């Protein structure tokens, strides 16, 4: 009987998981559009999402070119606490980057004044460093310092976590951003200044029982989405998880066999590489095949630069199917056409990301909303299953 009780306790300990609820909010793009500021923003800022994946390093100032404009369309955000007592911040949980950044009281830029700012003097556990970091984007740089403190995330106390405290943030557009900072969940190999990512620090301290985390993004307008640290909750998906090997341990990069529509290959006919990225809202790929897809679904560019589709056409459009590791993952038109306040916008975006293995695709939130996703660091693989 004692052995049965012990085994039960062990099984229970292995099932412990920490959930961080995500709230879906109005994107920065939508806010700027409603305020009549989007056109001016697009003129001033040359949007190039590719810079997120291929940063330009400039030693010794440790410059990392990761433009925050990449988060223009983000809608899912969670709350973390930093310091003792905890100071709360709304962040993007981003599997396409590896650093944790929040504004600080040392920042007097307009964008910082409208967001939560970390005050080291209010935390009894903060440790300063002499390191500085700069993130280049748009027409200037977000400069900051690095420090260590306790990060509260989903009930986990992540002690001695290195993070960035911004000192300057250029451009007024971030004033309207629905988030304070970024929490990166990619591999440590792409971390700026060699900073240990949050999940790595959590695992290294033995705070979770499994070296993995999982993501469920709800199509609901506000609630239901979640990041799960250290576990998998089968109530969020149907069927079984299909596992896909990570091909490059930097981003969560995998191989896509093909992309088809009506049974015909429309892209990636001989296979291609893709990054599964919660920090990118759309499905992005090389400009040429994306242009063909836009044409196939009847999308045309409007004055704001969005690719719009007739809302009445959605019901007649076909699924676009991503075949990954031999398994088909259909994305229906109700998912790849984004509907908002009477307008319908294509969820595809052209972006050239050349690598030694060919052009990269990005499977962003449009895809992840359809498929519960497990990011398994222990086995360097991604698990996918249809959402429940």
UniProtKB/Swiss-Prot annotation:
Domain Peptidase A1, first and last residues per copy: 76-385
Entries under InterPro entries matching the protein: Aspartic_peptidase_A1 (IPR001461), Aspartic_peptidase_AS (IPR001969), Aspartic_peptidase_N (IPR012848), Pepsin_A (IPR034162), PEPTIDASE_A1 (IPR033121), Peptidase_aspartic_dom_sf (IPR021109)
Record-listed E.C. numbers: 3.4.23.1
GO terms assigned for molecular function: aspartic-type endopeptidase activity
Pfam families given in the database record: A1_Propeptide, Asp
Keyword Disulfide bond: yes
Any GO BP annotation: proteolysis
SUPFAM superfamilies for this protein: Acid proteases
EC main group: hydrolase
Reactions catalysed: Preferential cleavage: hydrophobic, preferably aromatic, residues in P1 and P1' positions. Cleaves 1-Phe-|-Val-2, 4-Gln-|-His-5, 13-Glu-|-Ala-14, 14-Ala-|-Leu-15, 15-Leu-|-Tyr-16, 16-Tyr-|-Leu-17, 23-Gly-|-Phe-24, 24-Phe-|-Phe-25 and 25-Phe-|-Tyr-26 bonds in the B chain of insulin
Principal location class: secreted
Assigned keywords, A-Z: Aspartyl protease, Digestion, Disulfide bond, Hydrolase, Protease, Secreted, Signal, Zymogen
Residues in the signal sequence: 1-15
Cystine bridges: 107-112, 268-272, 311-344
One Gene Ontology CC term in the entry: multivesicular body lumen
Active site as annotated: 94, 277
Taxonomic superkingdom: Eukaryota
Propeptide intervals in chain numbering: 16-62
Subcellular location: Secreted
Homology family: Belongs to the peptidase A1 family.
Free-text function comment from the UniProt entry: Shows particularly broad specificity; although bonds involving phenylalanine and leucine are preferred, many others are also cleaved to some extent.
Protein name: Pepsin A-3
């Amino acid at each position: 009987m004692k052995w049965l009780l012990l085994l039960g306790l062990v099984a229970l300990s292995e099932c412990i998981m920490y959930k961080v609820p995500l709230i879906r909010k109005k994107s920065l793009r939508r806010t700027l559009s409603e305020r009549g500021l989007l056109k001016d923003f697009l003129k001033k800022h040359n949007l190039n999402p590719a810079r997120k994946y291929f940063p330009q390093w400039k030693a010794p100032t440790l410059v990392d070119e990761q433009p925050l404009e990449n988060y223009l369309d983000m809608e899912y955000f969670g709350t973390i606490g930093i310091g003792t007592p905890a100071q709360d911040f709304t962040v993007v949980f981003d599997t396409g980057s590896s650093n944790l950044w929040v504004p600080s009281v040392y920042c007097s830029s307009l964008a910082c004044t409208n967001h939560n700012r970390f005050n080291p003097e209010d935390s009894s556990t903060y440790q300063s460093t002499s390191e500085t970091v700069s993130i280049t984007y748009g027409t200037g740089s977000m400069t900051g310092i690095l420090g260590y403190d306790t990060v509260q995330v989903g009930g986990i106390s992540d002690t001695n976590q290195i993070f960035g405290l911004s000192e300057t943030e250029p451009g007024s557009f971030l004033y309207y951003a629905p988030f304070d900072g970024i929490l990166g969940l990619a591999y440590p190999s792409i971390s700026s200044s060699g900073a240990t990512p949050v999940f790595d620090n959590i695992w290294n301290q033995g705070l979770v029982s499994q070296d993995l985390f999982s993501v469920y993004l709800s199509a609901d307008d506000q609630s239901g989405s979640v990041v799960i640290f250290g576990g998998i909750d089968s109530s969020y998906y149907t069927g079984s998880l299909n596992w896909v090997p990570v091909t490059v341990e930097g981003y969560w990069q995998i191989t896509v066999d093909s992309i088809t529509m009506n049974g015909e290959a429309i892209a990636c006919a001989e296979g291609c590489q893709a990054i599964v990225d919660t920090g990118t809202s759309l499905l992005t790929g090389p400009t040429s095949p994306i242009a063909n897809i836009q044409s196939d679904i009847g999308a045309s560019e409007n004055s704001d630069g969005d690719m719009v589709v007739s809302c009445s056409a959605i019901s007649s459009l076909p699924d676009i199917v991503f075949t990954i590791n031999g398994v088909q993952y259909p994305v229906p038109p109700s998912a790849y056409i984004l509907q908002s306040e009477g307008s319908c916008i294509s969820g595809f975006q052209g972006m050239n990301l050349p690598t030694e293995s060919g052009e990269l695709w990005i499977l962003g939130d449009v895809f992840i909303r359809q498929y519960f996703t497990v990011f398994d660091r222990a086995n360097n693989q991604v698990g996918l299953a249809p959402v429940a």
